[in-house]
Amino acid sequence: MKLRGLYAITDSQLLAGKFLSYVEAALEGGVTLLQYRDKSSDEARRLREAEALRDLCERYKTQLIINDDAELAARLNVGVHLGQTDGPLSPTRALLGYKAIIGSTCHAQLELAEQAAREGASYVAFGRFFNSNTKPGAPSCSLDLLDEAKRTLHLPICAIGGITLDNAAPLVAHGVDLLAVVHGLFGANSTAEVTRRARAFNELLKV
């Protein structure tokens, strides 16, 4: 499966009161991967929202990814994104099967990406590249890291962290396949603006 394009990530606080309408607006503009990210302990609501997103993604032929919850991903038969505190990737690959999309957070360390690749990751994510509202304390990445990753890794590379339409072009120029965006996509005043931004990100990536 070729993974290239916009990687939209939800934020429950940012999308409060407009969750599904803004997500559908993004899908209308074109989303390669949609990550459901919710750190709350309300499992019933998380299941309800994830099921709604799965149905939307099926309609728009977009792949749904669950953040940090392999069991929920298995229940819905979708992909998962794992952080460095979530343990080794191999058991998750065994749980979800060889076709599932599994991503791995690698911060600013190429070694973590190489390990994730060996364990069966579908893509690796580096970041943050810019100041991030979602993870303000995350270590920062350089464009040089992207160059090195492109030379040594043979799987899609995702960039995350404070990405907007104004700063994304250099990341694409240095070989990024997936632009993971939260506020730069969903921090809009209308659904029409969300759709416009999604299309503009895809134009940058020539998708």
From Swiss-Prot:
Q: Where are the transmembrane segments?
A: none
**What does the note under cofactor report?**
Binds 1 Mg(2+) ion per subunit.
Which GO molecular function annotation, any one, does this entry have?
magnesium ion binding
Any keyword Transferase? yes
Question: What are the entry keywords?
Answer: Magnesium, Metal-binding, Thiamine biosynthesis, Transferase
| Associated pathway | Cofactor biosynthesis; thiamine diphosphate biosynthesis; thiamine phosphate from 4-amino-2-methyl-5-diphosphomethylpyrimidine and 4-methyl-5-(2-phosphoethyl)-thiazole: step 1/1
Q: Name one GO cellular component term.
A: cytoplasm
Q: Which GO terms describe its biological process?
A: thiamine biosynthetic process; thiamine diphosphate biosynthetic process
Top-tier EC class: transferase
What this chain does, per the entry, is described as: Condenses 4-methyl-5-(beta-hydroxyethyl)thiazole monophosphate (THZ-P) and 2-methyl-4-amino-5-hydroxymethyl pyrimidine pyrophosphate (HMP-PP) to form thiamine monophosphate (TMP).
Q: What is this protein called?
A: Thiamine-phosphate synthase
